[in-house]
Swiss-Prot record:
Residues 14-168 are annotated as: A. It is an enzyme of class 3 (hydrolase). It comes from Homo sapiens (Human). Dual-specificity phosphatase. Preferentially dephosphorylates proteins modified by proline-directed kinases. This is Dual specificity protein phosphatase CDC14C. Residues 184-344 form the Tyrosine-protein phosphatase domain. The keyword Membrane applies. GO terms for molecular function: protein serine/threonine phosphatase activity; protein tyrosine phosphatase activity. Composed of two structurally equivalent A and B domains that adopt a dual specificity protein phosphatase (DSP) fold. Its main location: endoplasmic reticulum.
C-alpha cells in the first residue's frame, strides 16, 4: 500500500523520497528532486499554487477555499479521460512547511471524499515515521502551542458531522470575494450562525492603502444573510446606532487586544448568542484574536470539540484566528465549557430540575480549579474594566495583522490586475493596428 526508497521504511533517512498510496490510482509523495515524467504517471504539485498568506511565523493550515480547490483538482484529474490509465501523484518538495500543507490537503481529501477517519488518514501520511511540523499561531515571537495534522483532520470530520462543512453547497466565489480587505474582510465560521469580520470605522476610506469600512458597508450583506446581532469586542470606532437604526441588535464586550476574556465576558457572549434570533457577526479590531476566541468558546460548549480541534477549524475558515495566550485559555476552559454545554442540552430536553441545577453548580465550582496540562485556572478575580485608551496609544496586534493582510493582498492585486495605464496603452495599440490593417493592408489583399 505504501512505499519508500529505503528497504526499511520505518528508519528512513529524512532526505529519502517517500511515496504513499492514497487509493489504487492516487499517490502522495515527498520528493527531493524533480520527478521524471512517464507515460503511465501524472505528477503535479500545488506548492506554488495554493500558498498560505502568513501574518508572522505562521504558515498554515491552508484556508477552506484552498481545500475546496484542491479537492476539485483531484476529482477532475481522477475523472479525466486522458488520465484514466495513469497514476496520479501529488508531490511536494523539501520545504517542511509546504510538506505540512500538502499533507493537510491530502488528508482533508481522504476525510471528505474517501470517508477515511481522521486517524486512518493520519496513519497513511506518517508512514515511515514521516515528520510533519505542526502549525503555530499568527502572533509575533516564540510559540508554545501547536495544532497538528490530526487536530485538523478531526476538525474537518466534526465540521462535516455538524453541518459546518458541505462542499456541495460551498460558494467559492463568495468566500474568496468577501475575505479580501477591500470587500469587507469577513468569513463564515459556522454557516448561517457566525461571521467573523474586521472592525468597521466611522467612515469608509482608504487609509495608508488599507480599506476601512463603515457599518453601512456590511448592512445589506448582513440583512441578506439573516444576521440579526452584532458583537463588538474592541474600542468604539463607530456609533453603534448605525447598526441598531438598521434593525440589528448590537452589544459591546470590550477586552484588550491580544488578551483573554473574563468569565463574565464569556458568559455574556454565550447568553447573547444563545438568544439571538438569527446569525451573529463578531468583530474586534482585525477580527482575529478576540473574535476567534469567543466564537471558539461557543463551538466548544455546543459541539464538544476540543480546544485544538476548534482552533484548527476556525483557522481553516479564517486564517490567523486565536492568538498567543488565547490558545492556552481555550484549553483551560475546555472542560467547563463541555459541562455547560451538557447542561444546556439537558435543559433543552426538558430534563431540568432542582437537583440537576444544584449538581451542575457543584461540578462547575470544582472545574474552576482543575489543572489542565499543568496550567491552573487562575481566573478567579475579575480584572479591571477594559478602557478604550488601551488601544489608542501605540500599535496593537490587530493593527499589525490588518496591515499585513492589506500589504499581501495589494501585492496579489498588483500581479493579477493590470494598471489602468497598461490597459489604456494596450487598447490604443490595438486600435492603431486595426486601423492600419483596415486602411492599408486589407485593400491590397482584396484588390
Amino acid at each position: 500500500m505504501r512505499s519508500s526508497t529505503l528497504q526499511d521504511p520505518r528508519r528512513r533517512d529524512p532526505q529519502d523520497d517517500v511515496y504513499v498510496d492514497i487509493t489504487d490510482r492516487l499517490r502522495f509523495a515527498i520528493l527531493y528532486s524533480r520527478p521524471k515524467s512517464a507515460s503511465n504517471v501524472h505528477y503535479f504539485s500545488i506548492d506554488n499554487e495554493l500558498e498560505y498568506e502568513n501574518f508572522s511565523e505562521d504558515f498554515g493550515p491552508l484556508n477552506l477555499a484552498m481545500v475546496y480547490r484542491y479537492c476539485c483538482k483531484i476529482n477532475k484529474k481522477l475523472k479525466s479521460i486522458t488520465m484514466l490509465r495513469k497514476k496520479i501523484v501529488h508531490f511536494t518538495g523539501s520545504d517542511q512547511r509546504k510538506q505540512a500543507n500538502a499533507a493537510f490537503l491530502v488528508g482533508c481529501y481522504m476525510v471528505i471524499y474517501l470517508g477515511r477517519t481522521p486517524e486512518a488518514a493520519y496513519r497513511i501520511l506518517i508512514f515511515g515515521d514521516t515528520p510533519y511540523i505542526p502549525f503555530r499561531d499568527a502572533a509575533y515571537g516564540s510559540c508554545n502551542f501547536y495544532i497538528t495534522l490530526l487536530d485538523c483532520f478531526h476538525a474537518v470530520k466534526k465540521a462535516m458531522q455538524y453541518g459546518f462543512l458541505n462542499f456541495n453547497s460551498f460558494n467559492l466565489d463568495e468566500y474568496e470575494h468577501y475575505e479580501k480587505a477591500e470587500n469587507g474582510d469577513l468569513n463564515w465560521i459556522i454557516p448561517d450562525r457566525f461571521i467573523a469580520f474586521c472592525g468597521p470605522h466611522s467612515r469608509a476610506r482608504l487609509e495608508s492603502g488599507y480599506h476601512q469600512h463603515s457599518p453601512e458597508t456590511y448592512i445589506q450583506y448582513f440583512k441578506n444573510h439573516n444576521v440579526t446581532t452584532i458583537i463588538r469586542l474592541n474600542k468604539r470606532m463607530y456609533d453603534a446606532k448605525r447598526f441598531t437604526d438598521a434593525g440589528f441588535d448590537h452589544h459591546d464586550l470590550f477586552f484588550a487586544d491580544g488578551s483573554t476574556p473574563t468569565d463574565a465576558i464569556v458568559k455574556r457572549f454565550l447568553d447573547i448568542c444563545e438568544n439571538a434570533e438569527g446569525a451573529i457577526a463578531v468583530h474586534c479590531k482585525a477580527g482575529l484574536g478576540r473574535t476567534g476566541t469567543l466564537i471558539a468558546c461557543y463551538i466548544m460548549k455546543h459541539y464538544r470539540m476540543t480546544a485544538a480541534e476548534t482552533i484548527a477549524w476556525v483557522r481553516i475558515c479564517r486564517p490567523g484566528l486565536v492568538i498567543g495566550p488565547q490558545q492556552q485559555f481555550l484549553v483551560m476552559k475546555q472542560t467547563s465549557l463541555w459541562l455547560e454545554g451538557d447542561y444546556f442540552r439537558q435543559r433543552l430536553k426538558g430534563q431540568e430540575n432542582g437537583q440537576h441545577r444544584a449538581a451542575f453548580s457543584k461540578l462547575l465550582s470544582g472545574v474552576d480549579d482543575i489543572s489542565i496540562n499543568g496550567v491552573e485556572n487562575q481566573d478567579q478575580q475579575e480584572p479591571k474594566p477594559y478602557s478604550d485608551d488601551d488601544e489608542i496609544n501605540g500599535v496593537t496586534q490587530g493593527d499589525r495583522s490588518r496591515a499585513l493582510k492589506r500589504r499581501r493582498q495589494s501585492k496579489t492585486n498588483d500581479i493579477l490586475l493590470p494598471s489602468p495605464l497598461a490597459v489604456l496603452t494596450f487598447t490604443l495599440c490595438s486600435v492603431v493596428i486595426w486601423w492600419i490593417v483596415c486602411d492599408y493592408i486589407l485593400p491590397i489583399l482584396l484588390f
